[in-house]
């Protein structure tokens, strides 16, 4: 069996960003997957996708049984990811990961929030801002946090984006818009436990892997994964949380 591992590399715009560690992590993951597959006796090819040569690189993929898709461009680089996913779909080769349409849906948190609302799945109170001139809704609940809608991996999540009153919303929204391209949203901050839950498709149905809990050593509005607490090992915030994989789970969680 032969597997081709395709992964996104930092664009020229993002490679100089303070958030480039997220793309470095994609490369590390690709190499780890390559190593694991080799140990299982599977032949592999690693393809680091560059935004300037997406079409030629993907079109050149031949004689492989499966494409392991690790394309993870988001934010202003989202069009590159959409293009790459659409090309992978045209090859007629089985692939892992999202389809083009699915990638678009899950890359925009506002779209996901609307889908949850439509399906009556409860989520924290929220409001989207496209221009920064919108008035804050009276229904917003505080404290809230201001998030970029098109980024992942805690990009844009920081302590200074917590808002405790309606009068501060406009200032924080504009600041977030200056930092990142695209719309932002304000979401009620809810204290509680945080879990990472991976879901795979198995025989056409969702298959839930064991949850992993992020346990915080702080409380209140300090207890969430900022970019620094997730990626910067030298930052004080990094030591405020740890990963915990319990052997058993409370029935109410499952």
Language model features by range: what are they?
Residues 1-94, 101, 107, 111, ...:
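ATP-binding N-terminal substructure of ATP-dependent carboxylate-amine bond-forming enzymes
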Residues 12-15, 152-155, 234-237:
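Short acidic/His/Gly/Ser-rich catalytic and metal-binding motifs that mark active-site loops
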Residues 14, 75, 153, 194, ...:
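Conserved protein kinase catalytic core
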Residues 44, 94-95, 123, 144:
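Hydrophobic beta-strand scaffold residues
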Residues 48-50, 99, 127-130, 164, ...:
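Residues at the C-termini of beta-strands that transition into short coil/loop
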């Amino acid at each position: 069996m032969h597997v081709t591992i395709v992964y996104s590399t930092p664009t020229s715009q993002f490679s100089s960003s303070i958030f480039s560690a997220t793309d470095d992590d994609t490369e590390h993951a690709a190499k780890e997957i390559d190593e694991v597959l080799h140990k299982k006796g599977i032949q592999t090819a690693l393809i680091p996708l560059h935004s300037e040569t997406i079409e030629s690189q993907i079109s050149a993929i031949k004689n492989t049984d499966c494409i392991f898709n690790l394309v993870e461009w988001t934010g202003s680089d989202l069009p590159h990811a959409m293009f790459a996913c659409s090309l992978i779909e045209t090859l007629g080769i089985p692939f892992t990961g999202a389809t083009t349409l699915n990638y678009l849906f899950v890359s925009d948190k506002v779209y996901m929030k609307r889908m949850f609302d439509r399906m009556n799945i409860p989520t924290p109170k929220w409001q989207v801002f496209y221009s920064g001139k919108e008035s804050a809704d009276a229904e917003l609940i505080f404290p809230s946090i201001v998030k970029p809608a098109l980024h992942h991996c805690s990009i844009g999540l920081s302590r200074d984006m917590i808002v405790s009153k309606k009068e501060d919303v406009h200032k924080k929204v504009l600041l977030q818009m200056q930092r990142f391209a695209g719309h932002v949203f304000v979401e009620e901050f809810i204290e509680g436990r945080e879990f990472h839950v991976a879901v795979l498709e198995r025989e056409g149905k969702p298959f839930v892997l064991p949850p992993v809990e992020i346990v915080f050593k702080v409380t209140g509005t300090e207890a969430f994964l900022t970019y620094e607490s997730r990626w910067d090992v030298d930052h004080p915030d990094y030591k405020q949380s740890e990963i915990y994989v319990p052997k058993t789970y409370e029935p109410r969680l499952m």
